[in-house]
Amino acid sequence: MRVTPRTLQNYKKTARPIVTLTAWDYAIARLVDQAGVDVILVGDSLAMVALGYENTLPVTLEAMIHHTQAVCRGVKNALVVSDLPFLTYQESLSQAIHTAGRILKETTAQAIKLEGGHPAMAETVERLTRLGVPVMGHVGLTPQSVHTLGYRQQGNTELEATRVIQEAIALEQAGAFAVVLEHIPATLAQTITEKLTIPTIGIGAGRHCDGQVLVTADLLGLSEKAPPFAKQYLDLDNLITNAVQRYSDDVRTQQFPPHLGS
């Protein structure tokens, strides 16, 4: 049965942890979906993972649509959420509506995700949800703000913690169906999780969130530089390199293709 935003909200009520991973193409999406995750996020992290950029900022709306289309073709059960890329929704409400509309109309994603919970962003979320667009929020460390906030942990001071709490609450009140809490203290994440009636999805935010998300490339060992809070379950980087080296050796020593006789 297909996971929906309502499914995730029911999971919070029953204390069932929500499993989320990213995907950027058909092959990864198909495998992640087969493994039984609840949510597949087509994150703008594909800018680094799939396109080789240093951060998420350069990825375009066209690229996000292209990759989301590929991911959706590989998914049968998980909820697919697509990130809105940098400066494709922050300028105005009309821009946000246009961007979200393109993603939902040109792909088969079921929801979008955007960053920030300040008053203008909460207004954007409220407008989108009123138009029928399911929105996942994102507070704490917001990678699209790398040039102003950096990649440091957020919420360490009382002022910062209050801001993150207020933003999460504002997103819920605006109609978001879930919110990502990134790289904040575990105690702060627990406080937010207890205050909200919508699910919290943590990444580098401790174990007291309603669910967890990782960048799949970090999990598989494909990232050149994974964040300190990521856990690597497989060293696919070395496995792929070794397989390619073995193939190269076989070709150069004429062991491949095998001799099939005359």
UniProtKB/Swiss-Prot annotation:
Keywords: Cytoplasm, Magnesium, Metal-binding, Pantothenate biosynthesis, Transferase. Mg(2+) binds at D44, D83, E115. It is an enzyme of class 2 (transferase). The keyword Magnesium applies. Its EC number is 2.1.2.11. The keyword Transferase applies. GO terms for cellular component: cytoplasm. Its cofactor is Mg(2+). Binds 1 Mg(2+) ion per subunit. Transmembrane segments: none annotated. Pathway: Cofactor biosynthesis; (R)-pantothenate biosynthesis; (R)-pantoate from 3-methyl-2-oxobutanoate: step 1/2. Homodecamer; pentamer of dimers. This is 3-methyl-2-oxobutanoate hydroxymethyltransferase. It comes from Picosynechococcus sp. (strain ATCC 27264 / PCC 7002 / PR-6) (Agmenellum quadruplicatum).
